[in-house]
Amino acid sequence: MHYNKELIIKNINDGETFLGIEFGSTRIKAVLILEDGTPVAQGSHIWEKRLEHNIWTYHMDDIITGLQDCYQSLCKDILDKYDSQLTCLKGLGISAMMHGYLAFDKDNNLLVPFRTWRNTTTGEAANVLTNAFGFNIPERWSIAHLYQAVLNNEEHVNRIA
C-alpha cells in the first residue's frame, strides 16, 4: 500500500504507529512503522563495547544514554520529514543482541556486568550442554553463559530471579 505524507502524519498524530527498538552490537536502532509494517522514520545511536576484566560488556549508563540518543534521533527524523512530534504509540517492541548474559535479582538489579555475545569464556558449559541436549549449544548463547556461571560457582547465581 502506498501512503501519502498526510496519511503518515495522521497516523503519527493519532498514535497509530509502532516503534521497534533494537540493541545491536554496534548500534541501537529505532524504526517507526505503520500498521502494515511500512517504515516511516528511523533513528540510531552508535555505541562500542568495552573489554573490562577480560569480559566484553556495555555499561548500564551506555544503554540508557544510547537509548535516549537513539530516540532523540528518531524524533528528529519525524520532525524533519513530517513536521510532527511523536507523543503516543499503538505498540512498542524492544529486542537486544540474541546472545549474551544479563542476570537480574528479584528487584531488577543487574548482578554482574552485561556479558555480550563476543565473550567466548563458556567452552566447558557449551560442551556439557551440547552433550546433554544432543544439540549444538554455542559458547555465545545465554544458556552457556548461565551454566558456566553455575560451574564457576559465581556468587551471584543464587540471587538470580
Which residues are covered by each model-predicted region?
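N-terminal glycine/serine-rich phosphate-binding loop of ATP-dependent small-molecule kinases
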Residues: 1-112
